[in-house]
């Protein structure tokens, strides 16, 4: 049997429990056709790069699969029918990655570094303040006391 990595994007308006139920449903389809599910990673609700079927966010789930090609094809057919599945991608790999995927590792490192998952923003609007790289302004002629 071949090894696959499968990423599933589910709609934003369903709950995490419904996403887990979807994964279990597809696990049943795969096992009925002679395949096995490996590691399942829920990456959570993440923003999409562009809108897909009027959704700006999606629940991402990574699944390691050990199955024949016919079982994967049947699972993908079921995913195309399901309205809660926005997109999916199945890639054949030589071996499954041990431990956490790069997505979860990067997110955990970022949280440890600054304690928050959101990027920092600069304070203020258009005025960014003095950067220290310019000399002080010289006064204009009318500011020097020669009023008009």
From Swiss-Prot:
It comes from the Bacteria. GO terms for biological process: translation. One of its GO terms (cellular component) is cytosolic small ribosomal subunit. Keywords: Ribonucleoprotein, Ribosomal protein, RNA-binding, rRNA-binding. Residues 96-148 are annotated as: Disordered. GO terms for molecular function: small ribosomal subunit rRNA binding; structural constituent of ribosome. Gene3D superfamilies: 3.30.70.60. Binds together with bS18 to 16S ribosomal RNA. Belongs to the bacterial ribosomal protein bS6 family. This is Small ribosomal subunit protein bS6. It comes from Brucella suis (strain ATCC 23445 / NCTC 10510).
């Amino acid at each position: 049997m071949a090894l696959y990595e499968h990423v599933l994007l589910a709609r934003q308006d369903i709950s995490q429990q419904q996403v887990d139920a979807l994964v279990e449903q597809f696990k049943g389809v795969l096992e009925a056709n002679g395949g096995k599910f490996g590691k399942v990673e829920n990456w959570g609700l993440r923003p999409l790069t562009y809108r897909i079927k009027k959704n700006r966010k999606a629940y991402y789930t990574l699944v390691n699969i050990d199955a024949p090609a016919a079982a994967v094809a049947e699972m993908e057919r079921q995913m195309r029918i399901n309205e809660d599945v926005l997109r999916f991608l199945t890639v054949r790999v030589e071996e499954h990655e041990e431990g956490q995927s790069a997505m979860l590792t990067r997110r955990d490192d970022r949280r440890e570094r600054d304690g928050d998952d959101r990027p920092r923003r600069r304070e203020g609007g258009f005025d960014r303040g003095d950067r220290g790289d310019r000399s002080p302004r010289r006064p204009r002629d009318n500011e020097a006391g020669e009023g008009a």
